[in-house]
From Swiss-Prot:
One of its GO terms (molecular function) is 3'-5' exonuclease activity. It catalyses: Couples ATP hydrolysis with the unwinding of duplex DNA by translocating in the 3'-5' direction; ATP + H2O = ADP + phosphate + H(+). ATP binds at residues 24-31. The gene is addA. The lineage of its organism: Bacteria, Bacillati, Bacillota, Clostridia, Thermoanaerobacterales. This is ATP-dependent helicase/nuclease subunit A.
Amino acid sequence: MGTKWTEEQKQAITTRGSNLLVAAAAGSGKTAVLVERIINLITDEENPVDIDRLLVVTFTNAAASEMRERIAEALIAILDQNPEDKRLANQLTLLNKATITTIHSFCLEVVRNNFFLLDLDPNFRIGDDTETLLLQLEASEELFEEMYAKEDKDKEGFLTLVESYGGTKDDQDLQDILLRLYGFVRSLPWPEKWLKDVINTFRVEDNFKFETSKWAEVILDSLKVEISGILNTMLVAVDKLKNEAGLEGYFHAFQREAYEIEQLLQYDNWNEFKNHIQAIEFERLPNAGKDANKNVKEEVSNIRKKVKDKIKEIKEKFFSDSVEEIKDEIKALYPIMEALADLILLFDKKYKEKKREKGIIDFNDIEHFALQILTEIDEEGDVNPSEVALHYREKFEEIFVDEYQDSNLIQEEILSIIARENPPNRFMVGDVKQSIYRFRQANPYIFFEKYNSYSLDTGEKNQKILLYKNFRSRIEVIEAINYIFKKIMSKNIGEVNYTEEEKLNYGAEYEIPPEDSVTGGAVELHLIEKQKVEEEVEEKEEEKNEEKDFEEEEEDLIDDIQVEARVVAERIKQLFSQNFMVYDKNIKSYRAVDYRDIVVLLRATDRWAPVFLEELTQAGIPAFADTGTGYFDTTEIKTIISLLQVIDNPMQDIPLLAVLRSPIFSFTEEELIDLRLEDMEKTIYEAIKKASQREDELGEKAKNFLDTLKKWQEKAVYMPVDEFLWYLYKDTGYYSYVAAMPQGVQRQANLRILFERAKQYEETSFKGLFNFINFINRLKVSSGDMGSAKIVGENEKVVRIMSIHKSKGLEFPVVIVAGLGKQFNTKDLYQKILYHHFLGLGPEFVDFRRRISYPSIVKEAIKYKIKLEGLSEEMRVLYVALTRAKEKLILVGSARDIKKNVRKWANAAILQEKVSEYDILNGKSYMDWIGAAVIRHKDLEPLREFAGVSLSEEEDASKWEVKLWNKKDVLLEKEKNDKVDVVERLRSLDLDAHYSEFYKEVERRLNYVYPYEKACYLPAKLSVTEVKRILNAEVVDEDTTSIFEREVLKTPIFLEKKKGLTAAEKGIAMHLVMQKLDLDKDLSLEGIKEQIKDMVDREILTEEQAKEVNIHKIEGFFKTSLGERMLSSKNVKREVPFHIKLSSREIYKDLPEEYENEFIQVQGIIDCFFEEEDGLVLIDYKTDYVQEGKVEEIKERYKVQIELYSKALENITGKKVKEKYIYLFFNGNILEY
């Protein structure tokens, strides 16, 4: 039976001849609709379309792979019914070359196919983030040096920029502004035009009227939101004064003042608004009567004072200057903004030169080059399609765009230029409420523009279709989400009105659950009081009153996170103890909840995820956190970076203590305390110098440190940073040391990555340790952490801890959204120069001669707009988080003072159905929004009662359950539960009465035989070589007892006798050279020889290893057809590690059937693979000695290994391995599988 489509889904699948915008809510089946439309086009009886005539653009490579798979599955299903349909069979063949891809990949194809239209080397490659950041830093340094050296008017403008925005000590702040602004400008379709237009806005003419400018319009909008909030505050006071005896005069005065404030909301003209607000005066209040309620009088007087202060602040901030003075301020900014624009253009030119020299392009270049190829600019400046664009218009019958709400301006320009106009052929699907990538320059206004202009009527050229039926979530989840967002989401904040059209409609079908089971249920709201835990009674009073330093604040933050994590852990355990069940579509039945059904979502994972992971693990809950971070926080990297900092400047106490405490010098805590006591006023370094005069063990350690440091400092002066870094690894023995630590292989790999970064750094004009340390610090900030992603399959039985952004597109039966009390990040609002794609540049006004600065009126406008858009994005992030839930939604957040917060939420909800934009804008966290939205709900009565709040109840179909927690109780509860009073338990036992029973139980346990004993001896992990040996052993009838053989450990180097390299060691050397060879360089005998010499110099190879490498055989490989194909590929990967999960019965064939679900992780390293247009080519090198006539035997021996490599590679890349080879270095044979 086929899928039962709704009428709206059918319309989206079958409508032709229009541009279609499908607004698809969370869980509405948009991907299924998109796939069905493609299948519908392919199988159309009257006008069938070949799959390679469609362009399908997805947001990620994973989404593209999934789309391709879904289309393939659908085609195969149809073919099963129509096996004779040759055209349909051909579509499966065409599917491999169909353009189902990300926009970046499509643009890259355009550039590679048309590079000759650009001044571009056809052998270009895409630089990684580190490489391009280094080039940008190098270009900016060189540019600044050139600007300082100039002797013309450009230098004057540049020096004004440095004085205004460079920072207090150097010009670093200006360099940061340049790089940040350059990145933004390059995200726009026509960056130079944008810059020119923006600078011209500061060139104000005599007829310029600020009061009608776009900046004035934005500021007036912001002030109206502010005034509406002030008015509501006044109306609360008016309401409190009603019928208050003795305060009638107050009531009339407050009413009059509220009316005057309300009048401001009607003015859309700057001057009218200014005149009215300037005229507002707060006259002296009349005397209160003798019978007046003093509490009410004091409360309303405080409200009035706050209102007066707010009105005064608005007057002084925006209306103290005349429009002429504002005009002069903007005019004064023109020359400095012009100098900034010129600097950006000069930087762009220099950065392009650097990239050209390296033969690389960056990710922004891909889209810009594609746009350049696809467009032609005529004399009037109009943009027209080029011949290439017209070719694509002809080629693509329809253009599909998934996740359309996340498109940016340049992507929209590209897709528009290749789309047909008659008949229109665009199909765009997305949900603007899930647009959460503005930080990547995604622009939801692109979606809004079409949403507001497209028609719901069929047959229109531009048509929209609404899919708002949710097939994912239970009714309890949907009603709670609707209840929250109808209160807080609006056109101004959230950027969409949450109307009846936008709300989620229940469409899922959940069967009736079994009796005595727990399913679904009310949405839970867990509020945690973040009060400070009281000290133990025996602690001294003065210790309680000490001021908190940074470390204590950090500990408090960790405590707060721990408390939330423990609350979450407790709730997860309750789900299992209460027989909570979920509906499993695969088995079409209910089953007990599993750990894999649960996800914990966090807005930010950097600090939170590790704490949650630890707490859940300690609670006995298997958990996994895929943060994509952690590289710079690993022990080995922190230690080495600290060491480099100390070598550069030993006067830094924190890095120095880290190095002294590390295994490199192994100072004990007692010794470090002794050092500190040497001289409390001096630095640690000075204390070490003083301690080195001592005649004890500490003195010896201190002297050794100083001697070693001096030696390293001398070497650092003349050695390149990469060589010096490798020298440190070897000299300290730290590289070998970390190998013996847990995850030693990973730790060594981390150190090698740092070495590679140093190598990249040395290829630039930067030199020296100081600059390298600065570069690493910049890398942390600019490119984020470099943690390697960990892969967990969807069926792994663990609770996932992930960011809300990573959860987008996923769904889970149980969703726990934690950290809801965490404050929003608003740091972007406090940059010296703000920027906005519509409003332009917003600089600080700086008078560096008088040493004063303040936000310009332009900056105030942009600041408000950025805040508005940032909070709109946060609202959509919250929407994404809540809509991941299928059956159970649990919300967790902390607040410093819950009663105070509840009163704040009640004030926000007291006067109107919807929470005001003022209260939304002034909300500090998700919890402020949720609290204000739900506080009037009937189920929130216990919370209102707790806070002493009286508020009219609101009826709603949603169901809520509130639980209050206290930080102190949560922290102490765990400590209490960890202690077991064994004595009391023993006392309670009647040993005589139960002796025989205990005896029997002891005997039963001693004689117990575990039924799955063999599983205990199965290895958790095997190498590919071990798997090959086990499977090949079947021919000699080996059984699984071989898994119990003793592991033969490698003899340590210091115990080995020197006797030359073994065959295995020679093979390792050969593989190392094949891994490290630069394939872009000369690969003749001389070229290979020179590269090997360089590897020895950099201590990648030893002299002994280098002598054993047969360069003739390496050259021979590259002369083969296989080697030539590898060199011509644009994507070659070498030494790729992998893990793959296999059933134990696939490896140990004699295991019984009950071991089918016992899995073993198989690990290995793929020597090499490269990509061609139609798939991947896998190569494994072998250095074995091969007897004459034994080639086929070799091929058979490694068959299992090659198949495992192929399977792993397809899993990793999502691409088909089309060819598999072994290359035998011994005789140059190529064995194909």
